[in-house]
Amino acid sequence: FLCPIAVGSDTGGSIRMPSSFCGVTGFKPSFNKLSTSGVFPLSWSLDTIGPIAKTAKDCSIFVEEICKHQIANKNKDPFNGLTTSMLDNFVNLLSPNLKIGVPSDDFFSDVEEEVKKEFFKSIELMKSMGAEIIEVDLAWLLMARPVNVVITLAEAFSLHKHWLESDSKKYTFEVISRLVLGENISLNDYFSSM
């Protein structure tokens, strides 16, 4: 590994997808868990920062330390401060009362066998620790990407409109062609997507 941890921003998968392609762990914390202060925005309602690291434990340590720093600096912490290990908290939650939803086999039709095997291995581990595993229907997930695109494009255009008009030379043609798509998204479509 070139470095033990990297920090990225994730609006629609920019941490999670590259991580999964490279066999490392990418973690997108809950929205507003970590401050995005100093991050150049793309979508104010979806932008999140998070770690890319070798393991979930490494990601947990990163988030834990950032939360401690935010609390020490009196930044608003909507989750009352995470000062103990996220993984320890998760393990403590595993009980007969905890239910974990797992999609049906159809959901995994495009997933490589090795990835699928590791996923189900982790599910079996959680089951052995007391969690109840239930099958869930994630057909609605097919709408997630189009909804994300509407929100991201509308907010990105709104955020970048001033610079596109005043200093478009700082943008590549490819970026401009994506951003201007947001100009045609109606307020109704935007609010319906929220």
Segments and roles (model prediction):
Residues N92-G101, V150-M194:
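Short helix-loop capping/hinge segments that flank enzyme active sites or metal/cofactor-binding pockets
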Residues K28-K117:
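A short helix-breaking turn/cap at a secondary-structure junction
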Residues F1-S20, I52-A56, V63:
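Active-site-proximal alpha-helical scaffold in enzymes
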Residues K74-T83, N97-K99, P103-D106, V136-N148, ...:
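Flexible, acidic loop-helix segments that line cofactor/substrate-binding pockets
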Residues S20-V24, V147-T152:
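Short low-complexity, flexible loop/linker segments enriched in glycine and/or proline
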Residues M86, V111-D137, H160-S166, Y190, ...:
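Acyltransferase
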Residues I5-G8, S35, I71-P78, E132-D137:
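Acidic/polar loop patches that form or flank catalytic/metal-binding clefts of enzymes
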